[in-house]
Amino acid sequence: MSATDLVSELGARFGDAVLGEQTTRERFPTVWIRPEASAAVHRYLKHEVERPFRMLVDLWAIDETARKHREGQPPSGITIASHLMSHERNADIRLKVGLDAEYPSAKSIAGVYPNAAWYEREAYDMFGVEFEAQPHSLRILLPPGWEGHPMRKTQPGRATERPLFNMTAALFDAKEHALAADPEKFGLPTHRDGVELMILNYGPHSMATHGVFRIVLALDGEEIVAARPDIGFHHRGAEKMAERQTWHNFLPYTDRVDYLGGVMGEMPYLQAVEKACGITVPDRALTVRVMLSEMFRIMNHLLFYGTMAQDTGAMSPVFYMFVDRERGYRVIEAITGARMHPGYFRIGGLSMDLPQGWDRLVREFLDWMPARLADYEGMVLRNEIFQARTKGVAAYDTAMALDWGVTGPGLRATGSAWDVRKARPYSGFENFEFEIPVGHNGDCYDRTVVRVEEIRQSLKIIRQCVDNMPSGPIKADHPLTTPPPRERMLHDIETMIHHFVGASWGPVLPPGETTGQVETVRGLTQFALISDGEPSSYRTRIRTPSFPHLQMISAVAPGMMVADLVAYLGSIDYVMSDVDR
C-alpha cells in the first residue's frame, strides 16, 4: 500500500474527520484530522490497518500564530503533530490536529501509545496544551512553579528580555519544597497488602543515575513496587535557541544535544536543512561524515562499556577503555581541530578538508582496537559476576519496545534488526558493508553485547572509508552552501556578495517543512524543521532517543530489586542533555 493509498483509506474510514493532506518535501504523508477524531485515527493506524504503525516516534506542538506561510493548511492557532512509524512497511505518517491558540485543548492518545504521556506533558509545559485524560498533567522539563509556556511566540527568547530574577531565601525554600517526593503528586502507591511502602528519592545526585536525574521509588523492602522518573534538571531550551540563531549558527548547538555523540548530532539537522535547500552534498563530504560519525559511535560505546562494568562491580575496565578513547579523540582532534564538540560539518559539506596524514592516524587506531576488544570480552562479557548482574535483568520484548518508542541498541537487543543506516540509508551508508548486531532476550546483557558488536562494525565501516575515500570537493556548488567557498569570493561582485550575505546574514531557506533522521549512538534522532522564509528556523523540533527510553523505566522497573535498577540504568546508556535538551 502506497502513501497515497493510505491517505485514501483514512478518508474512506473517517470521512470528513480527515481534513486533507498537506504538501511537504517529505517522503511520507502529512495528514490533517479533526481534534475529536484524533484518538480513533491513532488507534486505527496502530491496531487495525494492514502492517500497522506500532511506534509513536514523536509528538510535539507548533505555535502557528506568527507564521506567514501556511498555504493549503487548515486554520490552527496551536498545532499538535504526531509522527508514527511502521517497521513492517518501512514507512512513516504524520498526523496534525489544529487547536485554538488561546485555550488549546486536545484528547490524549496515551491510551493508544503509552509513550505519548511524556510528549503530551511537554506540549503542556512548553505551549500550554491541555490534554484530556492525561494521567499526569504535570510540568516535565520546567520546575513546578514556572509561570507561562516558553515556546509560545509571545514568550521571550533571551534572558535579557525577561524581568530580573532574584532568588530570595523564601523562594528557595518554596522551590525546594515543591520538589519533595510526594507520592500523590507522582501517582505512587503508599501501601501494598496492608504494608506501608517506603518512598525513596533515587537521585538526582546518585552516581548510578549518570546525570542530574531522579527516580521516585515506592519500595517494599528492596523490591521496587512502582517507579516515577523525574527529569528536566538539565533543560537548556535547545529548541527555543534554534528560533533565534541563524540556520548556520545553530550547528554548534546540535553537538551538545547529546554531548557524547559529537558530529552525529549535526547529521539529522543538516539532512533537513539540505533537503529544504535542494543541496546535493559531494561524495567526499558524505564519506567523511560517515567516518567521523562512526568514530564517535565507538567513543560513546567505549564509555558505555566501561561504566556499565563499573556499575556492576568491575573497576578496572573503564580505565583501560579511557586509554582507547584518548587515542580516538586524538584522531578526531587532528581531523576536526576539536575533541568532543567539533562543529565540523557545514550546510552543503564540511568546514575544511582532511589534513595531511589523516589516513595513517585512522589506520593506527583501527589496528589498535581489535586486540583491546578481545581483552575486554574476558574482563566483562565472560565475567561470571557481570553475567549474574545482567542476564535476565530488565528484559522486555520487541512489542513492548515499540510501544514505548525504544530505538537503537535497546530495540535491537530484543531481536529487531531495525537500524536507520540500513533501513533508510543516508550519507552513502548504502555503499558500505556492515552487519546489524541483534540480541534475543532484550535484557541488560544483550544490550551490552549489541553495543560491543557495534564497535566492531563501526571499525569495519571506518576502514572502508579510509580505503575508498573519494577525491573531489568538500562543499556543494550551491548558492545556499554556508559559508560559501572562500576561494571563489573575489572572482566577481556576485560571488563576493554571496559570501558576505552567507557569512553575516546566513542562508534564507524556502518556506516549508523538512525532516532529518539518523541512527545516532543511542537510537533514532530526528529533527523536524519549519522554515517561514527567514534566516532562522520558525520551529525546530528535536526528537531524541533518550527521552522515551527513560519514560519506559516506569514500566520495566516494578518487580526488580534496587540493585538491579543500577544495572538497568547503565544498560539504557542515556545522556541527560539528550533527554532534557
Swiss-Prot record:
A Gene Ontology cellular component where this protein is annotated is: NADH dehydrogenase complex
Cross-referenced PROSITE patterns, in alphabetical order? COMPLEX1_49K
Which Cys pairs are S-S linked?
none
- A GO term for molecular function: NADH:ubiquinone reductase (non-electrogenic) activity
State its location(s): Cell inner membrane
Reactions listed under catalytic activity: a quinone + NADH + 5 H(+)(in) = a quinol + NAD(+) + 4 H(+)(out)
Role of this protein: NDH-1 shuttles electrons from NADH, via FMN and iron-sulfur (Fe-S) centers, to quinones in the respiratory chain. The immediate electron acceptor for the enzyme in this species is believed to be ubiquinone. Couples the redox reaction to proton translocation (for every two electrons transferred, four hydrogen ions are translocated across the cytoplasmic membrane), and thus conserves the redox energy in a proton gradient.
Q: Which InterPro entries match?
A: NADH_DH_suCD (IPR023062), NADH_Q_OxRdtase_suD (IPR001135), NADH_quin_OxRdtase_su_C/D-like (IPR037232), NADH_UbQ_OxRdtase_30kDa_su (IPR001268), NADH_UbQ_OxRdtase_49kDa_CS (IPR014029), NDH1_su_D/H (IPR022885), NiFe-Hase_large (IPR029014)
Which EC numbers does the record give? 7.1.1.-
The protein depicted here goes by the name: NADH-quinone oxidoreductase subunit C/D
NADH dehydrogenase I subunit D: where is this region?
A: 196-581
Per the record, the similarity remark reads:
In the N-terminal section; belongs to the complex I 30 kDa subunit family. In the C-terminal section; belongs to the complex I 49 kDa subunit family.
Instruction: State a single Pfam family of this protein.
Output: Complex1_49kDa
Q: Where is this region: NADH dehydrogenase I subunit C?
A: 1-172
Give membrane topology per the record: Peripheral membrane protein
Question: Which gene does this sequence derive from?
Answer: nuoC
For this UniProt record, the keywords arranged alphabetically read as follows: Cell inner membrane, Cell membrane, Membrane, Multifunctional enzyme, NAD, Quinone, Translocase, Transport, Ubiquinone
Q: What class of enzyme is it?
A: translocase
In terms of superkingdom, the source organism counts as Bacteria
Tell me, how does this one assemble?
NDH-1 is composed of 13 different subunits. Subunits NuoB, CD, E, F, and G constitute the peripheral sector of the complex.
